[in-house]
Swiss-Prot record:
Residues holding L-aspartate: K83, R165, R222
Name under which the protein is recorded: Aspartate carbamoyltransferase catalytic subunit
Example of a GO biological process term: 'de novo' UMP biosynthetic process
Sites where the protein binds carbamoyl phosphate: R54, T55, R104, H132, Q135, L261, P262
Keyword Ubl conjugation: no
Length: 299
C-alpha cells in the first residue's frame, strides 16, 4: 500500500498496472452509475498554492463519489502563509484536520517536503516544474483505454517540454513500457538533457510532419507563461506551434490527440470534432484514476 504519492519514480511498472486496473473498476462509480461509500467518514485536504480547476475538482469529485468529504484551501485563501506561517507548520496543522492531503505548490520539491512534515498521506498535484504523478497516471490510463495497450506504442510529445511538469513525469513512466518516443518542440523549449539521460527508452527529436503518419499518440502541451523567468523569453516562443484538423490529415485513423488542459491556442477547435480528439475524455479519466489513488492511500 502507498503511503505517499510524490513522484512517478516512486512507482514501478507493476504498481502502475495495479492502479490502472483499480481505476477501471471505479469507472461506473466515477460516472455516477453505481454508488460506493468506501471513504465515508474520511476527509481530504486540498491545499492549492497555485490556481487549479481540473485537478482540484477532479480530486473533489473522486473523494465525494467514494462517500468522503473535502476541505479546500486555494491560492487566494492561503491567509496564514501570507501572514508568515511556514509551509511545514501549515502541513502539520492541516494534517490534523484530515485523513490525506493533496498539495499543489509553485516550488519544486514542496510536495516531498510536505510529506516529511505530515502525519497523513500526501499526494503531489504538481510542484513547480517538478512532477505531476496523478496526471501521468491518468495519461497512461487514457492511452491504455483508447489504444488498448501500453507496450508497442509510438508517442510524440509536443510543445513546452522544458518547463512542463506533466511531461517530466510522463516521460519517466513511458520509459517503463516498450514505447518509441518522439520529442517535438522549439529549441528553446527542448526537454532538459538530464531528464533524457535519466530514462532508458528509445527517444529522438523530430518534426511533426516527419512522424505524423507513424504515431499512435500525439501529446500536446501549452507553453506555460508562468514558468518563464522573463516575459521576453516567453514572447519568443509564444504561438510557435498549433495543431489543426488539417495538420492531422496524414495521421492514422486510430491516432489519438491528448492534452493535459487547459489549452490556449496550441490545439485549434477544429480538432475537437475529429476522430482523433481525446483530451476531454482524458480529463474525465482523472476521476477514476484519482479514486484509485485515494482508496489506496486512505484505506
Amino acid at each position: 500500500m502507498m503511503r505517499h504519492l510524490i513522484s512517478i519514480g516512486d512507482l514501478d511498472r507493476e504498481d502502475i498496472n495495479y492502479i490502472l486496473k483499480k481505476a477501471e473498476e471505479f469507472e461506473d462509480v466515477a460516472r455516477g452509475e453505481k454508488k460506493l461509500r468506501i471513504l465515508e467518514g474520511k476527509i481530504l485536504g486540498n491545499l492549492f498554492f497555485e490556481p487549479s480547476t481540473r485537478t482540484r475538482m477532479s480530486f473533489e469529485t473522486a473523494m465525494k463519489r467514494l462517500g468522503g468529504d473535502v476541505i479546500n484551501m486555494t491560492a487566494q485563501e492561503a491567509s496564514s502563509i501570507a501572514k508568515g506561517e511556514t509551509l511545514a507548520d501549515t502541513i502539520r496543522v492541516v494534517s490534523g484536520y484530515c485523513d490525506a492531503i493533496v498539495i499543489r505548490h509553485p516550488l519544486e520539491g514542496a510536495a516531498r517536503f510536505a510529506a516529511e512534515n505530515s502525519s497523513v498521506p500526501v499526494i503531489n498535484a504538481g510542484d513547480g516544474a517538478g512532477q505531476h504523478p496523478t496526471q501521468t497516471l491518468l495519461d497512461l490510463y487514457t492511452i491504455k483505454k483508447e489504444c488498448g495497450r501500453l507496450d508497442g506504442i509510438t508517442i510524440a510529445l509536443m510543445g513546452d517540454l522544458k518547463y512542463s511538469r506533466t511531461i517530466h513525469s510522463l516521460i519517466k513512466a513511458l520509459a517503463l513500457f516498450d514505447m518509441r518516443i518522439y520529442l517535438i518542440s522549439p529549441e528553446a523549449l527542448a526537454l532538459p538533457e538530464d531528464i533524457i539521460e535519466d530514462v532508458s527508452a528509445e527517444i529522438r527529436r523530430a518534426r511533426l510532419e516527419e512522424v505524423i503518419s507513424e504515431i499512435d499518440v500525439l501529446y500536446v502541451t501549452r507553453i506555460q507563461k508562468e514558468r518563464f523567468p522573463d516575459e521576453e523569453e516567453y514572447r519568443k516562443v509564444s504561438g510557435s506551434y498549433r495543431i489543426t484538423a488539417e495538420t492531422l490529415k496524414s495521421a492514422k485513423d486510430s491516432m489519438i490527440v491528448m492534452h493535459p488542459l487547459p489549452r490556449v491556442d496550441e490545439i485549434h477547435p477544429s480538432v475537437d470534432s475529429t476522430k482523433h480528439a481525446r483530451y476531454f475524455q482524458q480529463s474525465f479519466y482523472g476521476v477514476p484514476v484519482r479514486m484509485a489513488i485515494l482508496s489506496e492511500v486512505m484505506l
